């Protein structure tokens, strides 16, 4: 919010503000929108506000900025359309969702799904060790099923700065 305190005086018509940082559902509307409401700025008319989660996987040689679909949710249809037009200049596929809250929730679902499945893979490895079964062989064999199974492997735990904390954003929001 302190960032908005610093930039609010520089906001002017024909700008688009897009929040990409992982956050709880509702934060774009609750924390950013109040700063752009004034006599000169009319949301969806001459200024736009959107949320578009960052979805980059650092070090991934297959998926990069241009070929990873981009999600965007604007506070108005014009905001979404403007955000899509901007991102479409550098990203192959831009998917518009109905609201910033939906876009915010997409990121939390993606990261919570990843956290749970990494934890499950680690638990399976512990169980396999106790049973004298090769966990890697179990996972590789299970991965041959063409549907209903997504391969996750055991390792040192959750990586990155966001995966471990993202489920807590949702928990906090639901308990406020």
Which stretches of residues belong to each language-model region?
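Structural/interface elements that position substrates and couple domains in central-metabolism enzymes
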Residues: 1-176
């Amino acid at each position: 919010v302190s960032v908005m305190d610093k930039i609010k005086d520089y906001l002017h018509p024909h700008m688009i503000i897009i929040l990409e940082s992982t956050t709880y559902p509702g934060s774009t509307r609750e924390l950013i929108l109040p700063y752009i409401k004034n006599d000169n700025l009319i949301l969806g008319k001459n200024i736009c506000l959107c949320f578009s989660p960052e979805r980059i996987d650092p070090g991934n040689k297959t998926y990069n900025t241009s070929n990873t679909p981009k999600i965007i949710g604007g506070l108005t249809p014009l905001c979404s359309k403007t955000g899509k037009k901007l991102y479409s200049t550098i990203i192959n596929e831009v998917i518009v969702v109905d609201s910033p809250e939906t876009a915010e929730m997409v990121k939390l679902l993606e990261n919570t799904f990843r956290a749970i499945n990494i934890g499950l893979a680690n638990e399976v490895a512990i169980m396999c060790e106790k049973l004298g079964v090769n966990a890697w062989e179990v996972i590789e064999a299970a991965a041959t099923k063409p549907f209903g199974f997504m391969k996750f492997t055991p390792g040192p735990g959750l990586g990155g700065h966001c995966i471990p904390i993202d489920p807590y954003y949702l928990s906090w929001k639901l308990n406020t």
